[in-house]
Regions:
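Alpha-helical elements of Rossmann-like donor-binding domains used by nucleotide-donor carbohydrate transfer enzymes
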Residues: 92-93, 121-122, 217-218, 249
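A structural signal for short hydrophobic beta-strand segments in well-ordered beta-sheet cores
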Residues: 26, 155-157, 231
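Conserved N-terminal catalytic core of the sugar/cofactor nucleotidyltransferase
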Residues: 2-6, 14-16, 20, 28, ...
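The conserved acidic donor/metal-binding loop of glycosyltransferases
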Residues: 110-114
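Short, high-confidence coil segments that cap the C-terminus of an alpha-helix
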Residues: 46-47, 103, 130-131, 226-227
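Short acidic/His/Gly/Ser-rich catalytic and metal-binding motifs that mark active-site loops
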Residues: 11-17, 194-197
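Conserved core of the sugar-phosphate nucleotidyltransferase
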Residues: 116-201
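Conserved alpha/beta core of the MobA/IspD/sugar-nucleotide pyrophosphorylase nucleotidyltransferase superfamily
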Residues: 4, 177-262
Length: 262
């Protein structure tokens, strides 16, 4: 069994400004909500999903009432008093409240993406390699990389695909198709390890971006302690839905492909 922790406490202000009426995880993309697409990326029998939500959303937004039935094994964590400090803070709060298993292999998965991959094979290889962490990456041509302004979490890796450094809103290659881009899926050997290094990150305000702590940057502290962080380029098909522009671009490309296949 693994646990997949999905922080979904945000307000999604850019989507609200763009006229969307559902919070980001519940926006429909080709007939399914974003959160349903994410759940479909994992083996249902061997995965417990831990959804971190704001208590205000659980009370006032009917979309959240669907969460208990979205997967076979579900835990919903309610966060009361909330500050916008990013997914790392949400994870740490859930851990301190005893909602994150200390010993299980743990993935923190962002709530605005989809990829085609084999999650079971990925977990098995992480266990076989006995890595402390792993960041599945995508390389090559992906439409979300075309706009010059679109930069994400970029991984600098050695010849064996182990992490040397990760930076947010950055590309280690001028040609972005050559860089290793994080897919927003973050593996840790255990919940305890994820918490320890998340807590380390939050001790350093200079490691926040606009006041938020990103899970990606936790791994620089693992590297600093000589931990093994594997960055396989095993994501061949990736969908980025983080902003209204990302979603519009995705829909445009899907319509182009549908037209080409007629």
């Amino acid at each position: 069994m693994i646990q997949v922790v999905i922080p979904m406490t945000g307000y999604g202000s850019r989507f609200v400004k763009a006229g969307y009426t559902h919070l980001k995880p519940f926006i429909k993309v080709f007939g399914k909500t974003m959160i349903e697409w994410i759940v479909s990326m994992y083996d249902q029998d061997s995965t417990e999903f831990v959804f971190i939500c704001r208590s205000a959303h659980l009370v006032s937004d009917k979309d959240f009432q669907k969460l208990p039935f979205i997967a076979k094994h579900v835990k919903i964590v309610s966060i009361g008093w909330w500050l916008k400090l990013g997914p790392v803070n949400d994870f740490c709060r859930a851990y301190k409240e005893g909602e994150i298993d200390k010993s299980l292999p743990t993935i923190v998965n962002y709530c605005d993406l989809f990829c085609l991959w084999n999650s079971r094979s990925f977990i098995e290889e992480c266990l076989d390699r006995d890595v402390d962490g792993s960041i599945p990456c995508y390389t090559g041509f992906h439409p979300n990389l075309i706009p010059k302004k679109n930069v994400y979490a970029s991984c600098k890796v050695n010849s064996d695909q182990y992490l040397e450094e990760i930076k947010e809103k950055f590309s280690f290659e001028e040609d972005k198709t050559l860089a290793h881009h994080s897919a927003g899926i973050y593996y840790f050997k255990s919940g305890e390890m994820a918490y320890h290094y998340s807590n380390e990150l939050m001790k350093h305000d200079n490691d926040s971006l606009n006041g938020e702590f990103y899970t990606s940057l936790v791994y620089n502290y693992l590297v600093k302690d000589s931990k093994k962080v594997w960055c396989p380029d095993n994501i061949k098909f990736y969908c980025q839905w983080g902003t209204p522009e990302d979603l519009e671009d995705f829909n445009m490309w899907m319509n182009v492909l549908k037209g080409a296949c007629k």
